[in-house]
Amino acid sequence: MLILAIISLITFVSMSKLSDNRAIIRLINIYLILVLVLDSFLYLLFLNNQTYTVMGELLIFNSFTFYIDMLIYFIMIVISSLYGYNLYNNNLYKTLFEPKKELIILFLINILGALLIVHSNDFITLFVAIELQSYSIYLITAIYNSSYKASKASMLYFFMGGILSILIAYSINTYYSVLNSYTLHSLDSLIINTLDLNLILIALSLGLLFKIGIAPLHKWLISIYENTPILITIYISLIPKISILSYLVLSNISINSLVISILAILTLLVGSVGGLLQIKIKRLLAFSGLTNAGYMMLLLLLNNNEFSYLYYITQYSISHLAIFMIIIFSIYYINYINNQYNPIIYVNQLKGLIHDNAYLVLSMAIVVFSFIGIPPLLGFFGKLNILMSILNNGYYFISIVLIVASLISALYYLYLLNVSIQDKNNILINSNETVSSVLSYILSSLIILITFGFIYNSLIIDIFNVYFN
């Protein structure tokens, strides 16, 4: 139903004659919320831990895919709310990006691709979904190319994405030549997996993982994050990661533990050490995302890893949205002497923010401590679940690497917080405008979820035990 809802939205926005993007976004938000609530009731009534396939087993529906659908919808609601907030402030919107109707359509197409990736039960469906997601992202990043660097980053995204798509397509074609099938179920009929088949699945897994910018092929994606408007950065740094990692966790095609272990360790170390050298906010958060991708990659080594993955991706998504919302809201208070809105590019632009809005700095502290993994915040339980899972499966060296990477990455998280509580070194003029009350409520809700995670942690575990065995 969620997939059909996105298709209907794409049709509506494409054919709509409304010229006011604010009206379109209001309708989209209301529609997404209603569909999400209705689909939740339908799930509780009918699905209830059952697995179904449709369209000749091309798509799969179960508890795992439904949860990821809800998470993607939730993220889209928050981002579209930020987009609406952007439209309501004429002086501020140019700082973020000038809104265009085409962008709304591209976002919806990208969401459709993400949902299809998660539900793919066939390699042909997977490839079509990946290309649907990839080409929409190419266009999303290309729309606002106002500089040479931005244009270069967009072309790099297209070039690297094309190469990885070729690798994925070649792997799928070779898989078919070996098994005469495009489904993973064909593996069940084999008594012994051949070396060729292992290499095929490794190549397919690498193509998918490099799509989300894991090390060592990470620089191109970080360049994209740096040179796109911040609202687009929030989206492309989260949704593709969720869809592809969710598919890998559900399908369990990453069968070679050695390759995944090496890439996960490399991603953890590059993400944690690389972040120490950054002075730009979006690059720092990009390396943070790389480190978190490394954490989630470790779960590909394990069987029955759905609970740990869903818990971690949920708390990471909440923290990711919260920290970017804090950065966006800071634009209201980091107003330079000419009273012009300026994008926050460097970390030191946040210097003295505590004197302008202590609540934002308190919120930042909570999110930063959650990223570090300080108990009893939500991020602590996410990392604890992963650590205990890999320890229970005998990956002791990787556990040590995880702890070391967490300690190193804590340094640049604390650097971000430390700058915001220092004395101001420039003359600031506070804005007369205020943050939208709706967005204030959204940010407050995210902070509450992060802060009081220990209260409902046992409830979350009970729910997962019921619906995910």
From Swiss-Prot:
Any idea which GO molecular function terms this record carries?
A: NADH dehydrogenase (ubiquinone) activity
What is one term from the GO cellular component aspect held by the record? mitochondrial inner membrane
Localisation: Mitochondrion inner membrane
| Signal peptide (from-to) | none
Q: How does it sit in the membrane?
A: Multi-pass membrane protein
Q: What is its EC number?
A: 7.1.1.2
Keywords from the UniProt entry: Electron transport, Membrane, Mitochondrion, Mitochondrion inner membrane, NAD, Respiratory chain, Translocase, Transmembrane, Transmembrane helix, Transport, Ubiquinone
Main localization of the protein described in the UniProt heading: mitochondrion
Complex formation: Complex I is composed of 37 different subunits.
Please give the function described in this protein's UniProt entry. Answer: Core subunit of the mitochondrial membrane respiratory chain NADH dehydrogenase (Complex I) that is believed to belong to the minimal assembly required for catalysis. Complex I functions in the transfer of electrons from NADH to the respiratory chain. The immediate electron acceptor for the enzyme is believed to be ubiquinone.
- How is this protein named in the record? NADH-ubiquinone oxidoreductase chain 2
- Look up and give the organism this protein is from: Yarrowia lipolytica (strain CLIB 122 / E 150) (Yeast)
Protein's gene: ND2
